[in-house]
Regions:
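Conserved MFS/SLC helix-loop-helix module at the cytosolic interface between two early adjacent transmembrane helices
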Residues: 85-124
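Central mid-sequence intracellular linker of multi-pass
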Residues: 164, 190-251
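Glycine-rich segments within core transmembrane alpha-helices of 12-TM secondary carriers
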Residues: 158-183, 187, 204-205
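Cytosolic juxtamembrane N-terminal segment immediately preceding the first transmembrane helix
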Residues: 2-52
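Cytoplasmic helix-loop-helix junction between adjacent transmembrane helices
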Residues: 129-166
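Residue-level signature of mid-helix packing/kink "hotspots" within the transmembrane helices
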Residues: 52, 80-88, 138, 172-173
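Extracytoplasmic
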Residues: 35-69, 175-179
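Helix-breaking motifs and short loop linkers at transmembrane-helix boundaries and internal kinks
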Residues: 66, 98, 119-125, 136, ...
Length: 264
């Protein structure tokens, strides 16, 4: 077992951890943000885009396929119902087969399902395809949040999560602009604008899913882009997290028991 005391200050204060980092610890944390958060941010953009693009597609898709607002509402409901139901099973699979394999697999599958929506011919095919997107995409967000706990010490985890989640408002803001431009391609190569929308916003998830296989690692111990010293340093920080989570409560209780004035 590694000796965490060599890399962690003797009087460690979690609230001021960022001020107590050694140069190596800061270097490791910076590597994690550059390698993981930037890439995961891009993944989440396309994940969120595949959720909301049906709203943009509905502007013209309804007229072409004879769909009304109720049908689009049901398609949205079916997506979120399957998304909620399959979230936990998907995370279980992630822990069984590994983050890299599972995230890559579900990205490719939901990318295919989202892209295939361009071939929808009516309400039933739309319902089925949106359910498939919900099933396959369900494990992505909770899976990534779990994945980040494998890499980031507790103090930096909130920042990592926040930077990753910024993709949601960014996608919402830019999605309407990009989707509006894609819809203007209506008639190109005899495809409707909404067909181009599902193709150009869905297929990138397939390509990114393939990239996940080569870019992500299941754990720090398997990361070739971290040196042996980096891995040791990160493990010491993670070990210290567990110590600070366990020790303070017991330490305070022990200290309180020793203060006789409290019991007078």
């Amino acid at each position: 077992m590694s000796d965490t005391s060599s890399a962690i200050p003797e009087k460690f204060d979690p609230a001021n951890q960022h001020k107590q980092l050694t140069a190596q610890q800061q270097s490791v944390i910076n590597k994690l943000f550059r390698r993981l958060i930037v890439f995961l941010f891009v993944l989440f953009i396309f994940s969120f885009l595949d959720r909301i693009n049906i709203g943009f597609a509905g502007l013209t898709m309804g007229q072409d396929l004879g769909l009304n607002a109720t049908m689009f509402g049901l398609a949205t409901t079916l997506f979120y119902a399957t998304y909620v139901i399959f979230g936990i099973p998907s995370n279980v699979m992630l822990s069984i087969v590994g983050a890299r394999r599972w995230i890559a697999t579900i990205m490719v599958l939901w990318g295919i399902a989202s892209t295939a929506t361009m071939f929808a011919t009516g309400p039933n095919s739309l319902y089925i395809l949106r359910m498939l997107v919900g099933i396959t995409e369900a494990g992505f967000l909770p899976g990534i949040l779990l994945y980040l706990t494998y890499w980031f010490p507790a103090f930096f985890r909130a920042r990592a999560n926040a930077l990753f989640m910024i993709a949601m408002p960014v996608t919402t803001a830019l999605g309407s602009i990009v989707s509006g431009y894609i819809l203007s391609m209506d008639g190109l190569l005899n495809l409707h604008g909404w067909q181009w929308l599902f193709l150009l916003e869905g297929f990138p998830s397939v390509l990114l899913g393939i990239m996940v296989w080569f870019w992500l690692d299941d754990s720090p111990s398997k990361a070739k882009w971290l040196t042996a010293d980096d891995k040791k340093c990160l493990q010491e920080m993670m070990d210290n997290d567990r110590l600070t989570l366990v020790q303070p409560e017991g330490a305070i209780s022990h200290h309180a028991m020793q203060q006789r004035s409290l019991w007078r």
